Amino acid sequence: MAASERRAFAHKINRTVAAEVRKQVSRERSGSPHSSRRCSSSLGVPLTEVVEPLDFEDVLLSRPPDAEPGPLRDLVEFPADDLELLLQPRECRTTEPGIPKDEKLDAQVRAAVEMYIEDWVIVHRRYQYLSAAYSPVTTDTQRERQKGLPRQVFEQDASGDERSGPEDSNDSRRGSGSPEDTPRSSGASSIFDLRNLAADSLLPSLLERAAPEDVDRRNETLRRQHRPPALLTLYPAPDEDEAVERCSRPEPPREHFGQRILVKCLSLKFEIEIEPIFGILALYDVREKKKISENFYFDLNSDSMKGLLRAHGTHPAISTLARSAIFSVTYPSPDIFLVIKLEKVLQQGDISECCEPYMVLKEVDTAKNKEKLEKLRLAAEQFCTRLGRYRMPFAWTAVHLANIVSSAGQLDRDSDSEGERRPAWTDRRRRGPQDRASSGDDACSFSGFRPATLTVTNFFKQEAERLSDEDLFKFLADMRRPSSLLRRLRPVTAQLKIDISPAPENPHFCLSPELLHIKPYPDPRGRPTKEILEFPAREVYAPHTSYRNLLYVYPHSLNFSSRQGSVRNLAVRVQYMTGEDPSQALPVIFGKSSCSEFTREAFTPVVYHNKSPEFYEEFKLHLPACVTENHHLLFTFYHVSCQPRPGTALETPVGFTWIPLLQHGRLRTGPFCLPVSVDQPPPSYSVLTPDVALPGMRWVDGHKGVFSVELTAVSSVHPQDPYLDKFFTLVHVLEEGAFPFRLKDTVLSEGNVEQELRASLAALRLASPEPLVAFSHHVLDKLVRLVIRPPIISGQIVNLGRGAFEAMAHVVSLVHRSLEAAQDARGHCPQLAAYVHYAFRLPGTEPSLPDGAPPVTVQAATLARGSGRPASLYLARSKSISSSNPDLAVAPGSVDDEVSRILASKLLHEELALQWVVSSSAVREAILQHAWFFFQLMVKSMALHLLLGQRLDTPRKLRFPGRFLDDITALVGSVGLEVITRVHKDVELAEHLNASLAFFLSDLLSLVDRGFVFSLVRAHYKQVATRLQSSPNPAALLTLRMEFTRILCSHEHYVTLNLPCCPLSPPASPSPSVSSTTSQSSTFSSQAPDPKVTSMFELSGPFRQQHFLAGLLLTELALALEPEAEGAFLLHKKAISAVHSLLCGHDTDPRYAEATVKARVAELYLPLLSIARDTLPRLHDFAEGPGQRSRLASMLDSDTEGEGDIAGTINPSVAMAIAGGPLAPGSRASISQGPPTASRAGCALSAESSRTLLACVLWVLKNTEPALLQRWATDLTLPQLGRLLDLLYLCLAAFEYKGKKAFERINSLTFKKSLDMKARLEEAILGTIGARQEMVRRSRERSPFGNPENVRWRKSVTHWKQTSDRVDKTKDEMEHEALVEGNLATEASLVVLDTLEIIVQTVMLSEARESVLGAVLKVVLYSLGSAQSALFLQHGLATQRALVSKFPELLFEEDTELCADLCLRLLRHCGSRISTIRTHASASLYLLMRQNFEIGHNFARVKMQVTMSLSSLVGTTQNFSEEHLRRSLKTILTYAEEDMGLRDSTFAEQVQDLMFNLHMILTDTVKMKEHQEDPEMLIDLMYRIARGYQGSPDLRLTWLQNMAGKHAELGNHAEAAQCMVHAAALVAEYLALLEDHRHLPVGCVSFQNISSNVLEESAISDDILSPDEEGFCSGKHFTELGLVGLLEQAAGYFTMGGLYEAVNEVYKNLIPILEAHRDYKKLAAVHGKLQEAFTKIMHQSSGWERVFGTYFRVGFYGAHFGDLDEQEFVYKEPSITKLAEISHRLEEFYTERFGDDVVEIIKDSNPVDKSKLDSQKAYIQITYVEPYFDTYELKDRVTYFDRNYGLRTFLFCTPFTPDGRAHGELPEQHKRKTLLSTDHAFPYIKTRIRVCHREETVLTPVEVAIEDMQKKTRELAFATEQDPPDAKMLQMVLQGSVGPTVNQGPLEVAQVFLAEIPEDPKLFRHHNKLRLCFKDFCKKCEDALRKNKALIGPDQKEYHRELERNYCRLREALQPLLTQRLPQLMAPTPPGLRNSLNRASFRKADL
């Protein structure tokens, strides 16, 4: 769509005077839409500058809340309970706290324990949940609120539901007779039919004569009923992408878990059962080569087997009987295996020997091997009795977890496809409630697979030399290979059944890794499930939240190969010792399975006869809370005697070693390689390491390391990082004051501890990320304490504030970096956010809920302000200050009694602000990266300060000291400057900083002086404004400022912050009645506007001052919508979305539910009306075409009147609207389109943005007090009021209901992001938002469209986008969307109607009311013409009746088109399927007639318009129901009969005559409905109806336009053009009779060159021009401008049809009119179009480039066709239509109409003998015909166009033989030529024309031969003379001419017809003519051969010689035939014979 068509309503604005207009606006506030809004007229403050806000607190003091009535009181001030302190108990997963009990804890452990049990301290803003940040309006919440909406009834939906209504019950197969031959039903029967119909119900009050005021009141009351309270609940939710203010409260810190898998061990069975077997489960990651879980020990032995160990066992603890385990996997991978190891009781023999029975003996052979089994059982019993406490490795296997979780049962796990040496398992899937489909995309996800039961059947025996984890990883890697080495091993056969499933959310009977009971734990006696601790494959960054202190000991290997003696069966015992006495072993080692919970010692499995065993054992220990220097692990090595020998002990100690657990205060972990002592360690050994060579001790292998062991701690107490350890140690030393203290090699004293602490603070940045994140809460707490509680050393305060602050910045940065992947959209780290929200508390305070205790006096003191502090912050303080505390004027080293008070007075927020302001550049950079954290910390500190000190009652101005506020000012200025300077370098950081600053200021609004915060906002705005002037890319800055404003406005008390209750608004007055309107001041009268009201509706200085935040937001919107705004498209969306989001929030906020409150809230947005009104030219045009809307504003604009108004704004679409049909896209041009709007209006808004803005406008109109709107309307100028009406018009178009079918068709794609939006948004982003460039470019590369320019108008592309990107919705969802859309359309229209009523009341008695009311009526008419619900139409028609009743002159004395338009609308609704609509439409139409009659005792105008409307309506509306229209006619008749007021007049009689007349017209024209699917018949009917109105030019013109529209719809542009030419001729004929102007056509004759058919328009009757008759030829088409419009449309259609020559003829008639009007612009355009037309003619001279049409003769035969029987037509079909195509189309159409097996196509072209046809069938004969021209015509028809235009005669030929065959031998082959003449020349106003004359000529065989030879000769001549020559074509023609042919070649023709001289003298002439033809043929062959010889190459010489030989043979054969002479040839021929010869051959020669 061209810009000029899109913005028709703005055409009247004159660009040349734009500067003057701007000046005038700044002086006079005239409100031109294109004047700059940058100057606010009230105080002269430009919009680009921020006004000084009011002092908020002072304003509130001067206006206490009690001053407001009732509910408005809550809008004045924040609620008293706005801020509260919550102590939320920390969530504990276990039933026991799990913290150390009654132990003397050191400072570090105590601090950790306290942290893990203390409550969360939460500062709660009680109403924050109501803000847009925390309670967003989303699609889901909207849907919830939309429940219970009433269903609106729409005509288009009703018509779809009632297809089987009476109107469709007629027999669709009845004859399609021609209407012109069908007699009209008699008047008597028509009257009878109408009288017998039932009328609809009558409106009881219609015939009452009520006062207008009463009618208005009644209408308003009815309109107010059952309205939805929240308009925007019906509108789609705000765009989530724009919601920069979106926040969510962080999740409380919780223990980290990965994806959890539940493994249940069900049973373990071997072929033989002789001894107990014990199992171990663990997870291993092969890729990472890491064990990723602790061990789970299970015991599935039977009681009898367990009984064998009774001698060694104690009563097993319930926790060791677990058979289920929950494993956690943080990093799922396809390389994870569940490894199952089996152990057995130690026995004599190596592992292979012990496994042999299990591999050899089978259960089926039990009887055969009974003795062996008994022997084995006996041996096993002995070993269990003696060696029961020792274990030995037995077997192992592994399950590949990825196969389990990814397969859906496809794997056949019963089959051992990879051989017997591979572990086999079967998989049985349980299909139950937990059955979940596996994700095919993510095969490694362990969270959503189907539970599986595995049966593991094969185990591998353990190999003594390959027990280490390294060997295990090799085995596991090998298992995945097809050629596994394990296949060659013999398996240990067993059956282990295990269940693997996703772990449930809250499993019952679950134990933590510390064996604590996890909630819920219903019964302590139930068999537990164990949570297995994960050892993540990679780092996991999560803070510790609970106490955990576990130590894992992994003995790896022992090398006793050099040890002398019998040391072979080695076992390692481990003990946790608190001292050196054997009794000091602590019971902290976790038991395995079926044993006690904790033990004092544990042993490794024994490898038989191995002096250098490897171990896979894992010992798990519970570390004591306090680990001291004496705590150590003692390892004792035993030789175990497997065979009982007399005098030999069971176990012999053969070595000792140990590991001290604490060294320099740090827990020792990691790998160790320890020497082993042969002797027992000496006293005091525990404080030393074994590496120290103690005197007198013997060591294995000369004190070398022979025992490899590894310690791993999982502790939330011990950081295990040197830098963190040192930091915590130093802090706790300072807290305890325990000097001196040894730290590694350094002895800390009071003198050097400060230096060490500073170094430790600086070194924190070197800490490992994982422990730093884990202990981040501890670290941050300590740093906060150091900032605000500086330690005292030797009586001196150590100023560590800066160092601690810098350390805090680095720690936060490290934590951020580590958790980068987990950050939210705003770059916040969830863990840090959770720390601030939950964990942070002010050190030294015990938070409790304030309960009236006296406030603690706290002085505001800050640390020293360094030299980096800006000079502006000193505020002229001259007092000398202490280096550590600025409030102390004392020497730094002095000790004062007030030190304790000072220490208690440091406030974190003050220190943070100060340190930030004075920080160095490096630190500041780190802080800026994560400014949000420090801002939130500061805010929480301030809130705690107020809450704990009970300062909330303190006036806000006194809550915080001035110095702190100065620091805040400097800080905000500094951060704001960073935002501005970084926006072009690091956009992402700038965005995050901008948002952080906005949220900080928003938070401050709840805590400090709000006027102070507003001043900060203003300062920031000024900073941005300053930079904007020099910015290379202002759009980026404007975007950030927009987001900044949006965040500020998301505050939960946004409305209160805008001071809504202060007296800027005028006092409300009651809505005036008609009688009281005179007392009001009105712009239409001489009084001046009310400045108070004006300032409320404009972005005036007072408005922006008082409503500061609303002013900022609306100012941003106004600036973004300015035509010259930078980055407009992106800013439009952002600004409009911000307003929309706020209004949605108001609609859903329960605080504003009452109408009075919401009205006060709406006042904050009143300038939105002016903004939208002025933005009108750039809003998306939702109307189908310009229509009425383009003329509302201009009609009221006084500047457009006068001579410049040549445009008269005639628009053909107006007439088409009356006719009920749309024009073709190219036909909307008006004579006065003016300059293209886009160049003037700037960047147009997208459809989505425009619609959202209009929804916001409607919200304001709906919720504002009507009296206030009325006073505003009173002050508007006429142009402003016109633009307001334009806006309302656009609202109606934007929210028009699309119908259920539209939702089904596009699956609810109502204003979602189209490709157009996406492309433009990307463009905007690429220009402004640098951080997103890569993403956008990538998405663009993937786009199938490449360059997205001009995508806006690529409808096909947009359609593709809609259908391909949509998410398919269910029928219920589409039903719901249609329901909501219907309610939205209804409510939007009702709001518009309410506003129109207000405007009508405003201008009722003004001087300019006619022009305003005319525009109002146009909007009302548009609303009635669009798709509306029955509910709205009731109210809309009531308003229309009231309007026409009060101002009848609008319709009957002013604009004719208004009356025509109204009649059309009412008549359409009279035909509605919905009875209520018909009732109201009938009432309106009746009242219209009555009012017209009361004015002049005649209603000729209404009669004429209703008649015209009915004709148009029935002719063009498809879903029109004539039955319902008849009922409405009956209803009107009933009104006339019951109206007593006009009983004595002729009114009732006239109404009756009109109704009967309409009824008859309806009956006549209703046939058109039957032929909607038959385009030819439909056009014929329209043509005949138009011809029937030959005496009524208005109606004929209407029908011609209808036909043009239909033709355009069908793509028949030539025919559409002819319709417009006929219409223009009709108008010209009328104008020529009315007045004589030289520049006008003289009538139809002037158009004869365009079409000879046009002369039929001259039949115009004189009485039409009678001035006495009202309403005839009164349409605007019957003017010069109307004629111009019709001619332009004709030219447009001709151009589209490729008939460029006709375009010239049209413009020949148009140019003189334009010259007479001196419309040079239009003339330039016309000549440009002529140039284009002529250029195209030149380039398409051959004619092949444009094919004009194909013609067919179609004959209809049979009674089924009715009046078409035996009729012949010539059909014009699209170019290159084949005979088969039209045959198929017609056959298919009539088959559908008449039924199967009825229609037959006659295949030949022979004359049809009807007597031979089946009377029950319908026959169609179709023949291809060609245009025929006489010889004299060909002289004039030179060009291809000439031979395809103005065609009346057509020819077709039919071959036949005397015996009836089509083809036969040459002597009997005849040909019939048929000439057809049509009534009119093609192209005509229809595509089929009746044949009016037929002439046939029969050719004899010789004449046929003559024609054939002439044709061959012409072909030869053409091929020979072709330039450039075409050798191939020439040879082809030659070959066909001289080559030997099978039959009917030239030689055979000659032999047949020339061999003998005919006996009949009549044939002599034909004989001679054929002879001459052959002579000419031979000559042409010779010429062709000569030409061919010149063209060929050497390779074709032989071929040419062959052609010459053939030619010679042909010539020789022809020679005797051609030399015969006819003796009587020259004899005189009788006259009669001469004539017959002429007749027979005259027209055939050149065919």
From Swiss-Prot:
Localization: Cytoplasm; Cytoplasm, Perinuclear region
Disulfide feature: none
Tissue specificity remark: Widely expressed. Expressed at low level in spleen, cerebellum, hippocampus and in substantia nigra.
Keyword Phosphoprotein among UniProt keywords: yes
One Gene Ontology term, aspect cellular component: cytosol
Regions of compositional bias (Low complexity) in chain numbering: 32-42, 1071-1089
Region (Disordered): 20-42, 136-190, 213-254, 410-444, 1068-1090, 2025-2047
Domain C2 DOCK-type: 548-714
Biological processes annotated in GO: regulation of Rho protein signal transduction; small GTPase-mediated signal transduction
Listed Basic and acidic residues bias regions: 20-31, 160-174, 213-223, 244-254, 411-427
Keywords: Cytoplasm, Guanine-nucleotide releasing factor, Methylation, Phosphoprotein
All copies of domain DOCKER, residue ranges: 1587-2023
Family: Belongs to the DOCK family.
UniProt disease link: Adams-Oliver syndrome 2: A disorder characterized by the congenital absence of skin (aplasia cutis congenita) in combination with transverse limb defects. Aplasia cutis congenita can be located anywhere on the body, but in the vast majority of the cases, it is present on the posterior parietal region where it is often associated with an underlying defect of the parietal bones. Limb abnormalities are typically limb truncation defects affecting the distal phalanges or entire digits (true ectrodactyly). Only rarely, metatarsals/metacarpals or more proximal limb structures are also affected.
Record remark: domains: The DOCKER domain may mediate some GEF activity.
Protein name (database record): Dedicator of cytokinesis protein 6
Organism the protein comes from: Homo sapiens
